[in-house]
Amino acid sequence: MPQLNPGPWFAILVFSWLIFLTIIPTKILSHISPNEPTPVSAEKHKTESWDWPW
């Protein structure tokens, strides 16, 4: 019975967890924060308030 041989199944299990723990978290984190944080010294855009003409 080849199902009782743990060799190939253990390798598949280890390889699949290796993929889950290395590749997938990086993809999830890239979707959670897609933009790099701006440094503190970056200039802020000066926006002026605009009123409706009525």
Swiss-Prot record:
Gene Ontology, cellular component aspect = mitochondrial membrane; proton-transporting ATP synthase complex
**Keyword check for Mitochondrion:** yes
Query: Pfam families under this entry?
Result: ATP-synt_8
Task: For the region Disordered, give the residue spans.
Answer: 35-54
Subcellular location per UniProt equals: Mitochondrion membrane
Give an example GO molecular function: proton transmembrane transporter activity
UniProt keyword Coiled coil present: no
Q: What does this protein do?
A: Subunit 8, of the mitochondrial membrane ATP synthase complex (F(1)F(0) ATP synthase or Complex V) that produces ATP from ADP in the presence of a proton gradient across the membrane which is generated by electron transport complexes of the respiratory chain. ATP synthase complex consist of a soluble F(1) head domain - the catalytic core - and a membrane F(1) domain - the membrane proton channel. These two domains are linked by a central stalk rotating inside the F(1) region and a stationary peripheral stalk.
Q: What is this protein called?
A: ATP synthase F(0) complex subunit 8
